[in-house]
Amino acid sequence: MKKISAGLLLTDGAKLLVCHVTGRNFYDIPKGLVDDGEEPTAACIREVREETNLLIKREIIADLGVYEYTRDKDLHLFLLYRRDLPDTGNMGCSSFFINKAGRRLPEVDGYRYIALKEKEIYLTQNMARVIGTALTI
């Protein structure tokens, strides 16, 4: 059975919040695996808080559905449209991992807003494809 990640598209219609993945050469949306017994909406809210320190409420996000992401993982996307986007300078990551050298590092080490039309420049090919599909339905 495929794993499910839940993620948030935080946008004003032209720009999208992306997070720089520590140690990698690409950005990603705030997302993460849905734990056993966890609702995708709750997983999305939890992952956004862990990766950005943003507190979002269930009532203000729209469920965009589940999309085929990789061979072994699907992506359950949620949308938060805001005319005034939060300041990336106030964002921070409280979720860590241990790298190959044994150092404890944040999963995310930077934030920016990208133009939706430039998503292929910053995101992986699969993520750009899924977002393009989700936002055109």
Give short role names for the model-derived ranges:
Residues 67-100, 112-117, 129-137:
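Active-site-adjacent beta-strand/loop module that shapes the phosphate/pyrophosphate-binding cleft
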